[in-house]
């Protein structure tokens, strides 16, 4: 019998902050399971979840507006600790009898908080000591409204020069509010505060560890599928690879993986996937060579969205044919991860995250009555990688830069042709190889090469050449929502350019993309 790793759990109510998923990841990093729900949950749902504590997230709304989101009243009646963050603190204050008002002075960015009153939330946690001997905390603020009167039975724990109620607390009920964001790294002691709340105040035991998550997932897979067979579309990406390894550990040869070589992969990627998972790990894999089929379907198409849809449609067709040929398979496995679940959750209020369609497999034929196995659906990407390491997958594979689902189909601008893909594959391989050799690969968040469907004059020896152009792209980012172009050394860029032009017949010019996001996107299409 496996240990119940969900026994201690934190409920995070989402009021729309861009940082809400970060709160959940920080709680998970403490070894405690948590779930992220829209703010408009019912009392019955909270009771059923049975949280050890509740966190109210930040959000863009103003609590001074009549129709702005509110926490369910039951949150404050459940008898568990509650932590309100930014907007979460404001709605807590207002709902419990305090006052909030709009401020003419927004507080955004770094602030120093002075601790005035002892509180378990921040006891012995400080960045510095003020002139009067009071502990000081370096925090990250992002708010317009602020609490102007705290509820009865609360005390002011900390203040800034412009925000008198920076931390408030009702120690008896274990209710706490912080006007800043402890989940961001700019709040230097933020993780210690979250640790204090989750482990000490909520009394959670850290059970959410990679080894225990694997043990739990294996047990659940075995219970779900019994002695049945399972099919999985294996791409070689992080999510499908970790899903494959979990399923293989749980059911062994009763897993069949389908690897579709669409001709839009990186250099030698198809052979590497087959060698790693087939030869090395001993998984049962069907390799489907489908380059001609994909390229034929893409012929004459230059619109990026149409290309994406075409690639998705053909993949579904190819995968379905393989699935139908395996008559005894009763389960379909997918590498759905927790952010997919969050983003796909429609909320009647419209406050939930943007709805996103899954691109894992798409719609299977109606005649196929298959159950769905999603062993990663509770996990964030960083957790999936840690589990992959625990399962024995190589670090370089798990922490490789992101690669788009449509592959080179959206890195060849305009119409996709085999000639263009072959040139791009080789150019990209040189760029990545040089990044590794210069110890730069792990210092940038994403790097790749783009094929431009324009010809440029070049000189090779005594001759003139008129060949294609590629663009190098490297960015630095924390969350991929915004990004800066990477300031790679000139001599490095020169070396990459020389190698590409000299070693690849068909490319005459190399450029470097120095666009940030915004206004540009990271991928060109």
From Swiss-Prot:
Nucleotide-binding as a keyword of this entry, yes or no, is: yes
Q: Residue ranges of the GMPS ATP-PPase domain?
A: 208-400
A single GO molecular-function term is: GMP synthase activity
Kindly report, in one word, the top-level EC class recorded for this enzyme: ligase
Cite the active-site annotation: 86 (nucleophile), 181, 183
One of its Pfam families is GATase
Q: Which UniProt keywords apply?
A: ATP-binding, Glutamine amidotransferase, GMP biosynthesis, Ligase, Nucleotide-binding, Purine biosynthesis
Q: Which reaction does it catalyse?
A: XMP + L-glutamine + ATP + H2O = GMP + L-glutamate + AMP + diphosphate + 2 H(+)
Q: Where does ATP bind?
A: 235-241
UniProt superkingdom: Bacteria
EC number, UniProt record: 6.3.5.2
Its annotated pathway reads:
Purine metabolism; GMP biosynthesis; GMP from XMP (L-Gln route): step 1/1
- GO CC term (a single one): cytosol
PROSITE patterns, A to Z: GATASE_TYPE_1, GMPS_ATP_PPASE
Glutamine amidotransferase type-1 domain sequence ranges = 9-207
User: Does the keyword Methyltransferase feature in the UniProt annotation?
Assistant: no
Task: Describe the protein's quaternary organization and the partners it interacts with.
Answer: Homodimer.
Q: In UniProt terms, what function does this protein have?
A: Catalyzes the synthesis of GMP from XMP.
The protein depicted here goes by the name GMP synthase [glutamine-hydrolyzing]
The taxonomy runs: Bacteria, Pseudomonadati, Pseudomonadota, Gammaproteobacteria, Enterobacterales
